[in-house]
Every structure is written in structure tokens, then in C-alpha cells.
Amino acid sequence: MALVDVLDFIPENHPKRKELIKIIQDLADTLPKYQDKTGLWYQVLDKPNYRGNYLEASVSSMFMYGYAKAVSKGYLDKKYMSIAEKAYNGIMEHLIVKNPDGTLTLTKCCAVAGLGGHPYRDGSVEYYINERIRDNDSKATGPFIMGCLYLRR
């Protein structure tokens, strides 16, 4: 997502621009291997069967947005839009809750995760799957909304 966004500010003739687009293309080929059948991605991508790992909203929203925008900008072939669509459908089916007042809630957002500080944030699977989960975190809702715009939803 961030790499796709930053290309908006890198001139077309920049000598490293093609390298950045190649990174996006390589990621686009790799990430579907970790996409769950629901269309979502796990908090720890490569450990889907790890006890306590869960299908997470911010990563799924960020990847949905990244794919949709990269296709729209021409960095990826149109065939990759189906990955964004699958993610959108998964988010709508499994992570969006319609509230009694008509508003929507995006669930299963990791509140925060990162590295650094001893012994906290050690980068272990246990650390990542045990971080607090919250609803409507902006790092999930923002990419979800942006992805919806690129998907024309």
C-alpha cells in the first residue's frame, strides 16, 4: 500500500521508479499464496494454523487497497483486481458488522504492533497474535475506504 502510494510523488523519469514498480509486481505475485479462502490475510501471514492467529482487518484492507490502486495506476495487470475483489468480499462478509443504528463496524483490527523495546515488541509470533484487537482502527478503516473507492464500491 505505502509503496503504491509513494509512487504518486516519484517522477516518471526517476531512475529507480521501475525498480519500485517491480517490487510491487513481485509482492503481487507472492501475497495471494497467503490469502485465506475467505479473501482475508492472517495477522501473521505465514502461520495460518498457529493457535491464536486470526484473520486481521488492517492487513486485509491495506492489501485490498494496494492491489486495487496498483491495477488502477497500471503498475499491475488487470487480472490482479480479482485479488482485491476477493479481499473486499471477505472483509464485507467476515469483518463488517452492521449496527442497530445503521452504522458499520470494521472488526478484528490489531490496535498496534511493531518492533523494539526490550523485552516488549520482540517480533515473535506470540507477540503479534497477543496484541490488543479493536474495532474501527484508522489503519484499517482508511485503507478499506480508499480500496472501496478504487474498486468503485
Predicted regions: what they are:
Residues 4-7, 18-32, 64, 68, ...:
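Hydrophobic core segments within long, regular secondary-structure runs in both alpha-
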Residues 2-48, 52:
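Oxyanion-binding "anion nests"
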Residues 4-13, 69-74, 151-153:
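Amphipathic alpha-helix from the class-I
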